[in-house]
Amino acid sequence: MIDYERVSKFISLVLRHKPEAANLTVDKYGYAQVDELVAYLNKKYGGFTVTDLDTIVETDDKQRYSYNNDHTKIRAVQGHSFPVDLGLEAQQPPLLLFHGTSTKYLDSIMEKGIISKSRQYVHLSKDVDTAHTVGLRHGGGTVILVVNAEQMRKDGYKFFLSDNGVWLVDEVPTKYFTLYHCNTGFDLNLLKVIAGEYDDFFVHHERTEGQS
């Protein structure tokens, strides 16, 4: 029986970082040929078919992959370490966005801001829970960086929304975020309240200004 989780991790590696690991070439939009990928996976894992690939794409909890219109090509929807034209247009982000990380990275983040490192973009979450889940993956104390996306937008930064709901931006300088340690459930719930009240305040403020 094919281990879909294991295969999915390999597909992620290939489509995001190392297409040559599966003898693939990708076009400027990040797409690889489905038949070539399936042929390689069949050789590597045995008995792998297009149906198996469909299952992985459809059941992936992060929705990391997408097909082109006729399902002849496949790509990762974000997270590339090489330049890819995702065909995304700049969008207006929520007032706040969130970035989950670990305390072990804080010194670098406070010096350089949130940078993409090996990825094409910085990845930001639309809600606290998702950012917290991302932060937990790094181990150590979990920190959520609360990003003032609205101010960044006003200052000219462009935000893009990937097909799986991840917000993308080139960088986040230190002046646009604050730190919040989330070591307990209470910390996490308190941050949700604070973030919600921030949104409510600005929505109310904008409505009041519009009525004056």
Describe every region a protein language model picked out.
Residues 1-97, 102-122, 126-212:
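Conserved NAD+-utilizing ADP-ribose enzyme module
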